């Protein structure tokens, strides 16, 4: 993609439309450097205007849990452990510092030296983003443990929603180009979630933990993963992806629309095009990076990189002084490489012509018309899906290299035949699928005779169906079918006249059996393959009544099937009736526990406060006894202090255990509601979430199970 890519980076694959035509004759120039004289906490660096009519300055958190402000001799001491910081324009023409700790959110006004507000946040805050979300007013949004809070400049709670996992990074971006920004969040469960106001709109599955998100262009956001991958999305389509051995510290857009800055933890700073990832310029710092930010001084913007050792280096974009010369040299290098490749190819042809027939026979030549077939096969007895590779003319397969996103560890798999399989021309490679997602399998097959020192490489690409973990059962294998107890029922849409088209694309099924799904009536049993070999699936279709009933015990898989069906036939809205006895029973149990757990939490909180007050009182009395030289009473007070301290610790532990149980229950309840909403499509699915939240807020919990089963129209 870019001519000067370093060896550790590997470009993956990304066809994209031509992006904005920007001047690429630019470079990063170092303009300033200084030191904060403190070691800096990773990820805790911002740029903010802290005084009226002031300039932007760097604010960072030291490893000693102090907030350092450049050019100020004093630092801010926070008693709680700081996790993240941000800046928000809550002052009159200046910014306030937003501090996220392990138990609260603090808004601090440096200009007036006061705390604007402090709000308790259970389980702490891990990331911030400030801005306007949808129709809501501007606020600071705080990502925590499975929850997101929003606070305005007075500290009032203006937003709250639940997520499926911990929130590690967030950004605001106009995801669907409707003129309103959406909240994009990343989690350790490999998912990027997009929220429209307080309702989840889209889920994007990645291959590792999401570490950074940033809006970089209109309708486009960038992401980075824990394995060193960076890329961009426009809607649900990934535009490009690059993988590096280093990890990303920060991504942000810079000045012009379509440019993005990527700062790597090991010190590299890249200026890239957002639409294709091409590098315009690259520079570096000498030590590991804590974080980076964009700051303005007058009309100029600067990239400020802060290292872990406190050293700060600033860059700006300027027109390259030797850009035309560099381009000419790059073209010369490219043409020189092409010339070298052509000369090597010509040399091979010349050597070929000089070989005698006897030498060619000894060279174990492969026939010109050799072909390699790559297909999916199912071993019903072993309940296993395999990738079969077969070479024509009985040519031995000497090795297979498979690339597949998220399927193998490291995203690649190498098969080398053992000694007894050296001469085989047909091999089966087992595939164990953990997730329901469409995947491209890129294979490179190495062919050659056993004694040959030359191998022929043939490439092939196969699409792995989304629900390849299920295969249609024939009558003779009905013993492998387990009748599920859960099901959903919905009306067949007029657009879905031919279910066979969707089934053929989404499941592992023999092409000769696909047409059965277009018959007026039918029951079709699917067997689950490993590792889900104990989960069966059945379709009961009646085209005359225009109904479809799907039996399966896994609600997550059922939701994925419904969404895939609706997406294939472009169905905007769809109702369904769901029957999941175990799931609904679990939801009822959680709802019954909420009120008692809340009461216990309040009681434990009050008890803990009493214990803490008693400890403080005893400490004061003990110190007073020492001050008047009453050592016997002081000894008694310290003995009492030890007992009360142990009791306070026990009360705190009980409160923490109750809080953890409450959070887990609420997280599970939210997941159940989210899964049930995915059993519907469009507005009916969104109304499930809205109705359940309203029922909980109104203390009308008894109707929640009915909403989950029959929809929000009950």
Swiss-Prot record:
It is found in: Cell projection, Cilium; Cytoplasm, Cytoskeleton, Cilium basal body; Cytoplasm, Cytoskeleton, Cilium axoneme. Disulfide bonds: none annotated. Residues 332-361, 597-627 form a coiled coil. InterPro entries: Bardet-Biedl_syndrome_2_prot, BBS2_GAE_dom, BBS2_hp_dom, BBS2_Mid, BBS2_N, BBS2_pf_dom, WD40/YVTN_repeat-like_dom_sf, WD40_repeat_dom_sf. GO terms for cellular component: BBSome; ciliary basal body; cilium; cytoplasm; membrane; motile cilium; neuron projection. Expressed in ciliated cells including amphid and both inner and outer labial neurons of the head and in both phasmid neurons PHA and PHB in the tail at larval stages L1 and L2. Keywords: Cell projection, Cilium, Cilium biogenesis/degradation, Coiled coil, Cytoplasm, Cytoskeleton, Protein transport, Transport. GO terms for biological process: cilium assembly; non-motile cilium assembly; protein transport. It comes from the Eukaryota. Part of BBSome complex, that contains at least bbs-1, bbs-2, bbs-4, bbs-5, osm-12, bbs-8/ttc-8 and bbs-9. Component of the BBSome complex. The BBSome complex is thought to function as a coat complex required for sorting of specific membrane proteins to the primary cilia. The BBSome complex is required for ciliogenesis but is dispensable for centriolar satellite function. Required for proper BBSome complex assembly and its ciliary localization. Required for cilia biogenesis and both the assembly and movement of intraflagellar transport proteins along the ciliary axoneme. This is BBSome complex member bbs-2.
